[in-house]
């Protein structure tokens, strides 16, 4: 740091001498000469040749204060004073950059082009700068005041940023020259902007340095390396499948393993409608389409489906609906009571005592159902003949024939004997006598009517 400070002091002294020589050529009279009335504030100096250069601020010292003790003596110009060695150690004072140039000088300086930096001047540490300093078009002399104003700050930052500025000679020569030309053609800047850049710790080339840094960062990856600028595979923008935009030509494809014929996935198709549970179920095998999916998207479903054969000629016909079964509304308890009561009527114990039921039997032992339904106990349960017949179908004692009932097995044991019919001449004579008497009575009645 001591070496850097010494170099900065020597440079400041050299620039101050050069500025004195330059002023001797143009004269000492300048509207920028400001008499110093106070010893407490720093002195602001601007160059007449270069109104755009940063002002040089020098702090008050003990030697300078002795020069102004004599009030009768005219104070010397501000920039005729040699720069002190302490100027390299003391930074700019707040508020010193708020001075504005006179309107007449501002109007005259608008026609002067901005100088460019001299690329041949070395930095205090011996390294050459890649940014050319501004040069005046009408005068070949360098801007001494600009160098002296920024030497203190640039000497400290040049050693740190030297390694960062060297790459610009290789990559950004064009951008540096274009930046210099743009600066020379731009409108004149005021001292506020220049001092603002000086406060930030940078010189006139700090803005170019930042711009070139962005340019270098944007082009830090050469073509053919890193991210594949022109034909890079867009892996980081949602294209995680591994297929680049160049796959339409059929090159550089990363296809998945084949899963079937034609590089497509087997598609499960719905089989025919299901049949009733009694018949065997038919399961259709997975069918493969005749056309595969697109090569670019192997997982994309196929568009053409081949129909599969039906299991039988009626394969596309749905199952017939089952007819609902008709269940008669019956009461199991009622049927059980009817069955028990009728079986009691035709039991052996009841038939041996019940001559009325036996008298209703025909020669084959059949008894009409309406006779049984007329019984008091059965009539209390139901008077419906069909209900009685339905309840007796599961009986093991009574058998049914139409609407007649009889006992199973030994029904002939319970038949009553029949009385023989009356026959002979006596019977015939009596019948004839009765017939003759009837005829005679009729004849007599007719005669009596005629006589009257």
UniProtKB/Swiss-Prot annotation:
Domain HTH La-type RNA-binding: from-to ranges: 328-417
Record InterPro entries: La_dom_prot (IPR045180), La_HTH (IPR006630), WH-like_DNA-bd_sf (IPR036388), WH_DNA-bd_sf (IPR036390)
CDD domains, sorted: LAM (cd07323)
A GO term, aspect molecular function: mRNA binding
Predominant location: cytoplasm
Residue numbers spanned by region Disordered: 1-251, 419-452
CC annotations in GO: cytoplasm; nucleus
Compositional bias segments (type: Basic and acidic residues): 225-236
Function: Promotes leaf senescence.
Family: Belongs to the LARP family.
Entry protein name: La-related protein 1B
